[in-house]
């Protein structure tokens, strides 16, 4: 038998003697194979000179009979079915290693197996994990992301006052619901000044501007100022007053508000003094009787201030925002045209405009909308008017509010830049 490794040609012997020797050698080789067969569970263990991963062989010119070829084919299928799965790292490690040639058979007869390294590599079956590799899909490539509007949670603004008995947390919602019901009784007709014979809108503005200065000089609380203005408007909407009595109406309204809100009430003589003795003590007392009877002693009506406190709390405003909102709402007190807005709307607009002024952008969250019961669109008309008042607050003759809030006591808040963008947006729209 001639075997050429270079040409890979197998020459079959023809002599009868050689055939007999071949038969004996084949039987001996088969016995050797049976002795060397191992159990399946250790079939992958390395043998001396053997490959870890079973290689693919190409038989050329074999002398095996058809029956032996079928048996080997069955064994190969069984072997493939029992072979453990091959991982990606194992395949890469094995392909990177240099293939070693098989150990030649001990006898010169039997199966002559020749291994072509290049063909073996090409014929190597791909493991199941690599035949159909799973590529994780990128959701950004397959699905177009849609803008999802996440609702902003509503903050419980009363949770910090749960242990404060004076805050009346259990009843605060009912209280402000009642204020909303009653605020319509505190509103006056927007054209009531037309019924006055000797008065006009400018005279009212002069009176309110002067009372704001008096209120600041006496160091009275904010509730007193808002109640004073409310009493004046309600009285003038029901009673004709001469021009020379208008200042007296303002002094009496301030006196009644102090009696209702303040702990320490100014004496009548002090009020006469600040009027430059234009009125006497009896004039003050007589006007007090007239005003109470005209209003039917109905003093306690909600003004802008209780709403302002509640809405500032809902906005979680800092001190600067509180002062700016107070400045804006006091500017509105002077203007007669602002009477057409209900107290709650005016308070909410003051908070909204103050936030926009400080932040430089429109700001109104779901918590503010929930507690104020006004959307941002409902506030825009009133807000633009407040910005206009802020822009011209330092000019003209009525600058009492501007001078009050231009002091260090109020952090010079009146000098801050107005929210011009709110007015410009209305012009563009």
Swiss-Prot record:
Expressed in roots, stems, leaves, flowers and siliques. The keyword Cell division applies. GO terms for molecular function: cyclin-dependent protein serine/threonine kinase regulator activity. Pfam families: Cyclin_C (PF02984), Cyclin_N (PF00134). It comes from the Eukaryota. InterPro entries: Cyclin, Cyclin-like_dom, Cyclin-like_sf, Cyclin_A/B-like, Cyclin_C-dom, Cyclin_N, Cyclins_cyclin-box. Keywords: Cell cycle, Cell division, Cyclin. Belongs to the cyclin family. Cyclin AB subfamily. This is Cyclin-B2-1. Interacts with CDC20-1 and CDC20-2. GO terms for biological process: cell division; mitotic cell cycle phase transition.
């Amino acid at each position: 038998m001639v075997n050429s490794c270079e040409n890979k040609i197998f020459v079959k012997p023809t002599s009868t003697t050689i055939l007999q020797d071949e038969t004996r050698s084949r039987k001996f080789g088969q016995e050797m194979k049976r002795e060397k067969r191992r159990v399946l569970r250790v079939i992958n263990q390395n043998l001396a000179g053997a490959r870890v991963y079973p290689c693919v062989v190409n038989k050329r010119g074999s002398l095996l009979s058809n029956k032996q070829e079928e048996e080997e084919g069955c064994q190969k299928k069984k072997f493939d079915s029992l072979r453990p799965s091959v991982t990606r790292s194992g395949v890469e490690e094995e392909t990177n290693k240099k293939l070693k040639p098989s150990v030649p058979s001990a006898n010169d007869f039997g199966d002559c197996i020749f291994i072509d390294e290049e063909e073996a590599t090409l014929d190597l079956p791909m493991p199941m994990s690599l035949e159909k590799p799973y590529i994780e899909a990128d959701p950004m490539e397959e699905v177009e992301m849609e803008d999802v509007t996440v609702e902003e949670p509503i903050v419980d603004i009363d949770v910090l006052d749960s242990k404060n008995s004076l805050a009346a947390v259990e009843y605060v919602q009912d209280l402000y619901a009642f204020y909303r019901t009653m605020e319509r009784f505190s509103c006056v007709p927007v054209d009531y000044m037309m019924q006055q014979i000797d008065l006009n809108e400018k005279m009212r503005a002069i009176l309110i501007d002067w009372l704001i200065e008096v209120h600041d000089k006496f160091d009275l609380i904010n509730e007193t100022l808002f109640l004073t203005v409310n009493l004046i408007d309600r009285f003038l909407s029901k009673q004709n007053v001469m021009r020379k009595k208008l200042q007296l109406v303002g002094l009496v309204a301030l006196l009644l508000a102090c009696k209702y809100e303040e702990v320490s009430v100014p004496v009548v003589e002090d009020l006469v003094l600040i009027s430059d003795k234009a009125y006497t003590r009896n004039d003050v007392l007589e006007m007090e009787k007239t005003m109470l009877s005209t209003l039917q002693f109905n003093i306690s009506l909600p003004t802008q201030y209780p709403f302002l406190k509640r809405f500032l709390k809902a906005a979680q405003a800092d001190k600067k925002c509180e002062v700016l909102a107070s400045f804006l709402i006091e500017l509105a007190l002077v203007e007669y045209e602002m009477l057409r807005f209900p107290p709650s709307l005016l308070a909410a607009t003051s908070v909204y405009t103050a936030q926009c002024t400080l932040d430089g952008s429109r700001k109104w969250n779901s918590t503010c909308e929930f507690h104020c019961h006004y959307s941002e669109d409902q506030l825009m008309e009133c807000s633009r008017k407040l910005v206009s008042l802020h822009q011209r607050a330092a000019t003209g003759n009525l600058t009492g509010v501007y001078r009050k809030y231009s002091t260090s006591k109020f952090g010079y808040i009146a000098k801050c830049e107005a929210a011009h963008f709110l007015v410009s947006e209305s012009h563009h729209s």
